[in-house]
Amino acid sequence: MLSRFNIHQPFKRCKFRFFLRSIGNPDTILVESCSSSSCSSPEPSLVRSDYLTKPSDQDQIFPLNKIIARCVRSGDIDGALRVFHGMRAKNTITWNSLLIGISKDPSRMMEAHQLFDEIPEPDTFSYNIMLSCYVRNVNFEKAQSFFDRMPFKDAASWNTMITGYARRGEMEKARELFYSMMEKNEVSWNAMISGYIECGDLEKASHFFKVAPVRGVVAWTAMITGYMKAKKVELAEAMFKDMTVNKNLVTWNAMISGYVENSRPEDGLKLFRAMLEEGIRPNSSGLSSALLGCSELSALQLGRQIHQIVSKSTLCNDVTALTSLISMYCKCGELGDAWKLFEVMKKKDVVAWNAMISGYAQHGNADKALCLFREMIDNKIRPDWITFVAVLLACNHAGLVNIGMAYFESMVRDYKVEPQPDHYTCMVDLLGRAGKLEEALKLIRSMPFRPHAAVFGTLLGACRVHKNVELAEFAAEKLLQLNSQNAAGYVQLANIYASKNRWEDVARVRKRMKESNVVKVPGYSWIEIRNKVHHFRSSDRIHPELDSIHKKLKELEKKMKLAGYKPELEFALHNVEEEQKEKLLLWHSEKLAVAFGCIKLPQGSQIQVFKNLRICGDCHKAIKFISEIEKREIIVRDTTRFHHFKDGSCSCGDYW
């Protein structure tokens, strides 16, 4: 009878909390109607009192337990407490339901402990809730002590402790408990496999996987994740292919993210498409991995398709998914689309702000990046260490030395953010490229932790710009001491020697590189034309339209020289005649890609080229001339930033 009143909207507006305050003893029939209503939160209907009967206290327990559980699920612990304290009769389920909610909040540990002690007849589930609370929120000595004093333990009790130790990396203790456990289940085996994987011990993880009596999807996925983290992609592929159980979304995500993180974004995106064809809907994690792959490849069209998937799904307001889209648009050169998306986001967390600030920094728009940082502070968003990497990067790309130093000092003073290695790398780059090499070296020596390889690599790059051979030799030696397989260190030093025509030293560096079995990462550039990606390497001999590309480049070279272009021969890193050096420079991969864009794209339209290494000085100079000759905007993204070439100048102001 009562439930029919739920169709009347005025009655739905009556709030549940007001109801609890005004009626100390809710009626069972009314509560059951509330529980079955289609309302998003429990709300009573108003009815004539003569329709109601007075139930016993015991009859109220079940429906009120349901309300407590609903409050806990929605995070309304105070509401659950009000219902709890208003109940004249309770059972163990009542106590357990409230304990679940309170125990999840680290700040209410004492309250949870007190509540547990008050349970008249705690059962195994009560003990397991409290054990999980200790494992999550306090030191393991107390958790172990509580576990040892438990009057009865089930598989969940043992698994909680094993999983807790495994997540802390204490695998010996986890192993000891595992072998003390009388009846192990699938969760027990999964905890051991995952624990060894987190510790990087794939051998032991593989052993437990092989001897496990039941291997479910969790175990298979854990092994795939472990192999991907260890860069053993072929083993992960074999595991994925040989799975004897159905793959779930987490399994697909592990493979897709693994491909992208192991520099195989093409395979990751191919698998993402296969997942969609299987009818599996991606979650925010899978979409983020796919969008990262799009960013790596500058696959803008696929990125836009993923944007459509997000817009038509329940993830349309998901902060993680939208932030990944912003990052993708920024890295694909579509800063305008990124900004539009950022503006319409209903909720922005620090990660979203970081993505947009980083986008402006990568494109060399320091004013916008720093303005956005100030707006972020005004919006009471607390910056983190990644925020300051983006801010310092913006200063770096614009050569704002004093402003960068001010922000570096402000990090600790005003925001209590301790400088990380990445912050020091940004500052060394900022000082070094401004010619303040000694100050950069002084900063490295003042670092509160051991300098890392990247900071010496950055100093080495600055030495090349300013042709400081002595400091370059020091930086290179330090770099190679920290990472003897760092190809960039050898190449940078050889390039500095080459710029000084010290060919014997170049030969010595190359010999050392060969003896150390270090292979230089080959430079290449790519451009997307009508949804097809075209790759180019220096002195490319493979592309089917190479003849027309060479013809176009020779035409451009003549026009550039008439306009005042002189090749920067120091970037031709071979001991050959000047004429041969000019030819080598003309066939650099970024020039080949730009020329191909000039041929294939409509006159006056924008050209976007991407390179896997830093753009060379001669190419940077030449593309400025080409942008003026062709009357086009040419955008080149290298490993450090975006260069926007237009009307004979670059957005970086030649500061890169």
Swiss-Prot record:
A single MF term (Gene Ontology): zinc ion binding
GO biological process terms on file: RNA modification
Alphabetical list of PROSITE patterns matching this protein: PPR
PPR repeats: 60-94, 95-122, 123-153, 154-188, 189-215, 216-246, 248-282, 283-317, 318-348, 349-383, 384-414, 420-454
Primary localization class, coarse: mitochondrion
Region (Type E motif): 455-530
Record region (Type E(+) motif): 531-561
Full protein name: Pentatricopeptide repeat-containing protein At4g16835, mitochondrial
Organism per entry: Arabidopsis thaliana (Mouse-ear cress)
